[in-house]
A protein has these predicted regions:
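Extracellular interdomain linker/stem segments of modular secreted and single-pass surface proteins
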Residues: 1-3, 82-85
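Generic structural signal for short, solvent-exposed loop/turn connectors between secondary structure elements
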Residues: 13-19, 51-53, 84
Length: 85
């Protein structure tokens, strides 16, 4: 089976800066946690942010991520992260 992602949050985040593992986790078929690569972040106003999880306004952020398992199976995901004041 290819790797799978899971969001680590329930509900809204507060404005601030986060680590990837605060928000999204990935595992391989044997449930080993995998490194996640941040591809891009789009803020609620459509701005493409630098490669960091820095949420400075309320709204929905679109976070594109990628992971790869030991068998070189790659999986991409786009996760919508709601941020509230």
């Amino acid at each position: 089976a290819p790797p799978h992602f899971e969001t680590a949050i329930t509900g809204y985040l507060k404005i601030g800066t986060y680590q990837m593992t605060d928000i999204i986790k990935a595992w391989d078929y044997a449930e080993n946690e995998l490194q996640i690569q941040l591809m891009k972040v789009i803020s609620p106003d459509g701005t493409v942010l630098e490669n960091k999880l820095d949420f400075q306004m309320p709204g929905v952020y679109e976070v594109s991520v990628m992971t790869e398992d030991h068998d070189n199976r790659v999986r991409y995901a786009v996760v919508n992260i709601p941020v509230n004041e």
